Amino acid sequence: MQGHQPAAYTLRKHETEVTCLKVVSWEPYPVLASGDAKGELYLWNLVTRRPFAGYKLETKAQIIYIKWLNNYLIVLSKDHTLRFLQLHNETAVAIRGWAGNQFELQSFKIVYEVPVNTLNFANVVVTHMRESQYRLWCCNTMDSESIDVYEFDVKEQRSLRRLVSGINLYKAIIKAGNWSTGESLDKTGIVMCFLEHNGVVYLGYECGFVLGLQLVERSGENPTIVVSYVSSVHYPEPVLSLCYNEREEVILSSSTNDAIGVHALQAHSVNVSESEIAFFSIEEGIAIKRDLTLINKSIHLPTSKIGHLGCVDGRLIAVDWSGRTLVCEKDETKFCFSKQRSNVLVDESSAGTFDQGKAPRCHIKATSMACIGKQTLRELRGIRRGEKRRTELCANRSWCFTGYEDGSVIMQSFET
């Protein structure tokens, strides 16, 4: 069947750099959450390409991280605060948010706040534990090279409890059996990024290492951080981004060079039971596999300085520091686009290759990215025929959303 012609649209609402984008599950079709350098947040209807909800932080602090979980918009900002936001009127949004007509933006209210160290630009990991209780992985309050783990109840303002404090994983790295003692590494550097998948939390460090961690709680004892995976694939360059490739079942990482680290899940999805803990060396609350070795596997892309990674149906989407967005299949570029100072979207694709040496230098800087694959829609009820047709057209395409320093978001389709 012949593929669709690529489509591109511009989402305009932000007046400053778009620093964070996140696709959010919604009915009948996912929506996009966006945040900027001055603390403004929006939820976008991707069929009408209009915002239907918004919020402005009083501190005007830059948005670093966005997640939608259990009807909470979870937001980390540079004022050292993680906030749980909730729509004032979820029913109104559900009924009216999908209509094509203009209406006043729905607003959010703050339901919970947690202080978080944001001296660097690392994100956090937030997971749901039970009922209204959540777990937070983040940089240590005073030291961005170490991590803390908290639990809290969003319905109890004074429920914050620290499970793990100031864990530094430098010793775990140098204990890897095949780490060359001739290599120079006196510290990990700061934590650059976090990612959680299937109970394992992945950390990307300034020194180029990627670690897979689990938190084990045993009755009557303090929690233990289990180091189940270590890779030095990017050493000594910093890890810039982490993402999950569902089709290949791997975690991918990027850095300042052209290498994409490939971290296979089977190598580190360890279920640590009471009996298995004997195979670990435990010191200062950190458990390390006695046979821990570095696992370094990578592929290479025709660009470098990859600040943002995403995966859709096996395709790898990469955004580099110069402003280019590449859609790749393994190491081959299938589609490439950028936004120039002339405000024109430029298709740089050329027979599946990308010549970095001839790239123009007038791109607008890309500052955030999110992506979504083709969607299977449930039966569409209660919406007009025209809206139904437009929703189906959106669902039959894969999309990349790239945020730029001029406040715009490009919504670009591509084939998968």
Curated annotation (Swiss-Prot):
Query: What protein family does this chain belong to?
Result: Belongs to the WD repeat ASA1 family.
Starting at the broadest rank, the lineage of the source organism is: Eukaryota, Fungi, Dikarya, Ascomycota, Saccharomycotina
Question: What species was this sequence derived from?
Answer: Lachancea thermotolerans (strain ATCC 56472 / CBS 6340 / NRRL Y-8284)
Q: Which keywords fit this entry according to its UniProt record?
A: Chromatin regulator, Nucleus, Repeat, WD repeat
The answer on whether this UniProt entry bears the keyword Secreted reads: no
Identification of the protein by name: ASTRA-associated protein 1
Annotated WD repeats reside at 13-54, 58-95, 111-147, 234-273
A cellular component term from Gene Ontology for this protein is:
nucleus
Q: Which gene encodes it?
A: ASA1
Q: Where in the cell is it found?
A: Nucleus
